[in-house]
Each structure stands twice: as C-alpha cells, then as structure tokens.
C-alpha cells in the first residue's frame, strides 16, 4: 500500500467583527459591518465601463448599499430610494463611499447621486463610464434606478447617465438628475473634465424634498467654481438646494451645506439638523459641513475655481485640488467617515467629518486631520497626490479613501476628479488611466485596492477603504502559527 501524505488543515477564513468595515478589493468591495454601508467597491475591468460601485454585502443595516450597475443590487426598502437597475438603497445604512447612492434613512451617498430614504432615490448612479475610462464619477450609466418608493422621488435613470466618454471622461459626465426635483443638473465638463464635474450631480429630490437639480457642476477644463452643485444630495423634508453639495440624509437633508465658489473655495454651511459637524477647515480648504440627522452624506462644501476646495467639493479645476464629490457615503446612523477634502494644490487640512457618533467611534484612522499633498486621516488632502484617509468605525467605509479629493489633470485623490491621469484614492475618480484605490474609477484594468475600495488604474492597488473597529486590524495582523497556510 502506498503511503499517503496527510493533508494540512485548511486555513480559517479571515474576517472582521460585525461592526467592522469591509475588506476586499477589485470590484467587489468587502462586506460591510453592522452599521456599515458595505463595500462600495467599483469594478474596473479592462474597459472600466460600467464599473458598478457596489460591493459586498452590507451589514445588518447596510444591506443593498451598493450602487452596482447592471443587474441592480439591493432592493429598495419602504423608505429607500432604490429598486431596479442600479439601485442603491436599502436598509438604514445607505451608501458606501465613492459614488455610492445612499439608501434607507441615510440618504448620504457620497460621490454620485446621493439620495435614498426620504430624500428621493439616487439610483442610476452606477459608476459606469466610457469605453476606456472608468467613468469615474459617472452617475447613472447603464440603466437607471427603478424608481420610486413611497417617499422617494426615484432618481437618475433614463438618459441621465453621467458616463464619461471614450477619452477618459470621468468627472461628472452628463447630467444625473432624475426624480421629481432633479434633472437638469449638468455635472461635468468636456474632454474628460475630471474635476470639473461633480460626482453625481444632483440627485432627484423626493416627494418632500426640494432637492437637487438645476445646479451646474462646472464644465470644461476649469471645473467647478461658483455654484458648482456637484452632487446635490437633497434629502428629507428640507431638501437639498441646487448648489448644495453635501449629502444630506434622512430627515434633515443636505440643504444646509452650500457650495463655495470662486477660486478660494470656501467652506459650506453647517448641517441642517441635530448632528452638526465640526468644521475644522474653512477658507480655501473648505470646511466640512455635513448634513444629515441620521447620517451625514459625504462632505458638503464644494470648492470652486482653480483651487479646488474642501468638503466633498465638486469643484476643482485644472490644478486639481479637492475636487472630490462626496466623501464617504453616509452609512447607518453614523454618517460617513472621511469628511471634507483639502483644496488647492497644497492640500490643506480640510475639515474632518465629525458628528456626535463618528467622533466617538472613529477609529480608522484615528481622527487624523492630515491634509497637505499626502492627505491622510479623515481629511482628504487635495493637490495632485491626493491621498485621503479612511472612514470611521461605522462609516460606510467604501470608496477607498472615503471622499478623497483630487481631480484636475493630475488626478490625485479620488473624488470626482480624475483627469487624463485619473486619480488615486477614493471617490469617483477615473480618467483615461483610471484611478487606483477606491472610487468608481476604472481605467484600463481593474485591480485591487484594499479595504472597501475598488481598484482601477493600470497597476491596481491603491488606497484602502475605511475599515472597521480596531478588532478588524487585530484580526488581520494576527497569524495563528497552528494553521498551515501554504
């Protein structure tokens, strides 16, 4: 009888606790934690086109927070905007980072369309893109949202795709309106504008929302500027106002956060309801005004002009700067991580997205305000190198660097930026070369990226998404010697 070698015991699956945010990369995005919005990874693929911003399964409240294009992920819940096509909504968690569309009460949604819950459906905000670009901040693309639920205005869909062109488009792309109040919000400029557009433009306002629509998100090469609404995530009863860029959510809506204009950007207004955000930015770096009673929806203030600006700015110009459009999506009750993004080529601190809950639970990274060209921390530094940190404990955690900034031709950061060179980090970056890290970038190849981010760019890789509680890190660092992992 021949001797048989004993097979080694298989390795156990590595995962995080139920409150942890998601791992995974390359298109899939990781599973969300308990309050997490799930991974908002966006697949890159060879053409980058139609790369959905959806990701793994969400947690208990995170279900269906992905904005996947084609096939439609998640189903709309009673008060969620979602359903059909590339629905995003579902549960209380709402969207992951990047161009996720919020759902449930969160409304946040980060990059692309924001909406969900009472604010009217984001929907149709899959990060589809052109033939070669990842579409970057395209909203819509490939089908649109199924439509409205009881209190939802139904969003995007139809012709309101924001896909980029074959030249790498990125940036806002076309209009991403939709819904009763939406429509007409032109996001994005010509020839790959990248940072010129917002990542999503206005999401349609819901039944009780004034929201979205109307606000121009820049255009051409100069990008935002003025009232570059970017992704107006009007939500709730207060609605979001044309140039509002914040991702309001739940009942409060994003009405409070206005978009700064001019070359200096400027900070936005505060949040509308209870959970006000502490603004550390201001000036050219923009402040982080967040909105949302139940959740914040990404940053708010939108810088304009050439200096980009802070917050989830939809602004930015040829010089890049914090032209991100929505930071991390507001997830669950905690709102999004990340926060505003530093503007200008020198970056700057930006504001750290903080609410009563995220400030208590944020752990990845540790309330780092960073800024500068390398970004880091909750702040997403602007400038060409982008950077940007992950979300907090309960943030939806998707979108790579949770609302990275960047944009312009040099890319950098994630955000809605992404010019010819695309952008790294989170957000809806993209461009001809795609963006590494999270976001809805795509580029020529897919590729990974840690955390909930989804890669893009030729080499993949990129920054990781928001992670969960520290136990998640401990789990990843431990290596039990008793398991033969060969």
Curated annotation (Swiss-Prot):
Residues 451-468 have a biased composition (Gly residues). One of its GO terms (molecular function) is structural constituent of skin epidermis. It comes from the Eukaryota. Expressed in the epidermis of the ear (at protein level). Residues 451-486 are annotated as: Disordered. GO terms for cellular component: cornified envelope; cytoplasm; cytoplasmic side of plasma membrane. GO terms for biological process: keratinization. Substrate of transglutaminases. Some glutamines and lysines are cross-linked to other loricrin molecules and to SPRRs proteins. Keywords: Disulfide bond, Keratinization, Repeat. Major keratinocyte cell envelope protein. Transgenic mice expressing a C-terminal truncated form of loricrin exhibited, at birth, erythrokeratoderma with an epidermal barrier dysfunction. 4 days after birth, high-expressing transgenic animals showed a generalized scaling of the skin, as well as a constricting band encircling the tail and, by day 7, a thickening of the footpads. Transgenic mice also showed retention of nuclei in the stratum corneum. The mutant loricrin protein is found in the nucleus and cytoplasm of epidermal keratinocytes, but is not detect in the cornified cell envelope. This is Loricrin.
């Amino acid at each position: 009888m021949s001797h048989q070698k004993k097979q080694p015991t298989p390795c156990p699956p590595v995962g995080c606790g139920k409150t942890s945010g998601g791992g995974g990369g390359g298109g899939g995005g990781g599973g969300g934690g308990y309050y997490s919005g799930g991974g908002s990874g966006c697949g890159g693929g060879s053409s980058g086109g139609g790369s959905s911003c959806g990701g793994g399964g969400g947690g208990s409240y995170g279900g269906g927070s992905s904005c996947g294009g084609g096939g439609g992920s998640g189903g709309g819940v009673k008060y969620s905007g979602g359903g059909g096509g590339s629905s995003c909504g579902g549960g209380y968690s709402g969207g992951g980072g990047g161009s996720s569309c919020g759902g449930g009460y969160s409304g946040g949604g980060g990059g692309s369309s924001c909406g969900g819950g009472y604010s009217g459906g984001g929907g149709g905000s899959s990060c589809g893109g052109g033939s070669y670009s990842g579409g970057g901040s395209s909203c819509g693309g490939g089908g649109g949202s199924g439509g409205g639920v009881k209190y939802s205005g139904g969003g995007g869909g139809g012709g309101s795709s924001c896909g980029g062109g074959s030249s790498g488009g990125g940036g806002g792309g076309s209009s991403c309106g939709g819904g009763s109040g939406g429509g007409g919000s032109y996001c994005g400029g010509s020839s790959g504008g990248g940072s010129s557009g917002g990542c999503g433009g206005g999401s349609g306002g819901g039944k009780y929302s004034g929201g979205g629509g109307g606000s121009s998100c820049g255009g051409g090469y100069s990008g935002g500027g003025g009232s570059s609404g970017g992704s107006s995530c009007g939500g709730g009863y207060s609605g979001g106002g044309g140039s509002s860029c914040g991702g309001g959510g739940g009942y409060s809506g994003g009405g409070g956060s206005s978009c700064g204009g001019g070359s200096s950007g400027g900070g936005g207004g505060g949040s509308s309801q209870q959970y006000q955000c502490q603004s550390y930015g201001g000036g050219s770096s923009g402040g982080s005004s967040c909105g949302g009673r139940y959740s914040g929806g990404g940053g708010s203030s939108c810088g304009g002009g050439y200096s980009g600006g802070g917050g989830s700015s939809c602004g930015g110009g040829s010089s890049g700067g914090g032209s991100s459009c929505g930071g991390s999506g507001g997830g669950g009750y905690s709102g999004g991580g990340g926060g505003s993004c530093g503007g200008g080529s020198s970056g700057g601190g930006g504001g750290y997205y903080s609410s009563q809950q995220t400030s208590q639970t944020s752990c990845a990274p540790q309330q780092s305000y960073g800024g500068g060209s390398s970004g880091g921390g909750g702040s997403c530094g602007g400038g060409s190198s982008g950077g940007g940190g992950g979300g907090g404990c309960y943030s939806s955690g998707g979108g790579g660097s949770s609302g990275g900034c960047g944009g312009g031709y040099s890319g950098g950061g994630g955000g809605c930026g992404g010019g010819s060179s695309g952008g790294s980090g989170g957000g809806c970056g993209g461009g001809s070369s795609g963006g590494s890290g999270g976001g809805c970038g795509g580029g020529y190849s897919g590729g990974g990226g840690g955390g909930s981010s989804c890669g893009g760019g030729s080499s993949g890789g990129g920054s990781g998404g928001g992670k969960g509680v520290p136990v998640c890190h401990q789990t990843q660092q431990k290596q039990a010697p008793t398991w033969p992992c060969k």
